C-alpha cells in the first residue's frame, strides 16, 4: 500500500504513520518513501483486512491509500510500488470520493494513459482518422465520436443507434461515409482494436486535462 495525506492541510509524520500501521497489522513493515508511507502486508493479513476496517484506520490517520495486487516475491516490490502509485493517481483523477483505491479497479485508465506515452493523441492518428478529424473540424456531426461509440458497442448498429439517438438508416449512412474515409475494413479485429485504443485514450486524455484545468 502507498499512503499519502488526505489533504495538504492534514499531515501526520511518516514515522507516526508507519508505527501506527505496523501496530495495526502484525507482521507488516512500513516506512517513509518519496513523501509517502509504504506498507507491505503479509498475504493473510490482507485477506483479514476488510474495506470497512481499513477505511476506519485511514480516516483516523487522515490518509488515503493506493493498494497494489498481491505479490509473493519481495523483489517485486518495485512493481507493487508502481501499482499502488498508479491506483492513487487514477483514483484521484476520477474525482472519486473514496479513500482506498485498488490498482485492479483502474486497469483500463492506466492502460489508456500508458498507450499514448505522454504524447497528444493525434500523433497516433492513422491517415483515415486524420480525414475524419478534418471532416469534424468543419461539421456539426462528429465522425470520430460516431466511430468511437460504434467501436465501444462492438460494431452493433442497433446499440450504436440507441446510444447516439439516431435512426438506424441515418447511422448506416453515416457509417458508410466513415468507412469510406477510413479506407480500411472495420471487420479486421486488429484494426478495430487500434482505432478503439486511440480514440478511448484520447477521451481519457481530455478528461484528465479538464480536471487539471479546474
What name fits each language-model region?
Residues 1-214:
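Cytosolic nucleotide-utilizing catalytic cores of signal-transduction proteins
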Amino acid at each position: 500500500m502507498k499512503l499519502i495525506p488526505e489533504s495538504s492541510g492534514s499531515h501526520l509524520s511518516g514515522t507516526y504513520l508507519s508505527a501506527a500501521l505496523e501496530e495495526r497489522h502484525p507482521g507488516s513493515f512500513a516506512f517513509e518513501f518519496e513523501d509517502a508511507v509504504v506498507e507491505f502486508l503479509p498475504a493473510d493479513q490482507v485477506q483479514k483486512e476488510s474495506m470497512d476496517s481499513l477505511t476506519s484506520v485511514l480516516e483516523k490517520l487522515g490518509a488515503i491509500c493506493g493498494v497494489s495486487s498481491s505479490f509473493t516475491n519481495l523483489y517485486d516490490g518495485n512493481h507493487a510500488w508502481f501499482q499502488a502509485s498508479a491506483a492513487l493517481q487514477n483514483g484521484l483523477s476520477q474525482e472519486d470520493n473514496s479513500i482506498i483505491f485498488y490498482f485492479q479497479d483502474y486497469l483500463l485508465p492506466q492502460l489508456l494513459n500508458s498507450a499514448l506515452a505522454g504524447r497528444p493523441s493525434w500523433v497516433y492518428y492513422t491517415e483515415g482518422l486524420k480525414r475524419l478529424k478534418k471532416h469534424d473540424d468543419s461539421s456539426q456531426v462528429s465522425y470520430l465520436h460516431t466511430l468511437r461509440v460504434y467501436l465501444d458497442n462492438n460494431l452493433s448498429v442497433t446499440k450504436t443507434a440507441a446510444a447516439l439517438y439516431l435512426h438506424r438508416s441515418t447511422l448506416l449512412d453515416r457509417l458508410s461515409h466513415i468507412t469510406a474515409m477510413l479506407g480500411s475494413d472495420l471487420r479486421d479485429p486488429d484494426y478495430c482494436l487500434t482505432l478503439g485504443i486511440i480514440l478511448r485514450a484520447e477521451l481519457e486524455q481530455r478528461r484528465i486535462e479538464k480536471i487539471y484545468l479546474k
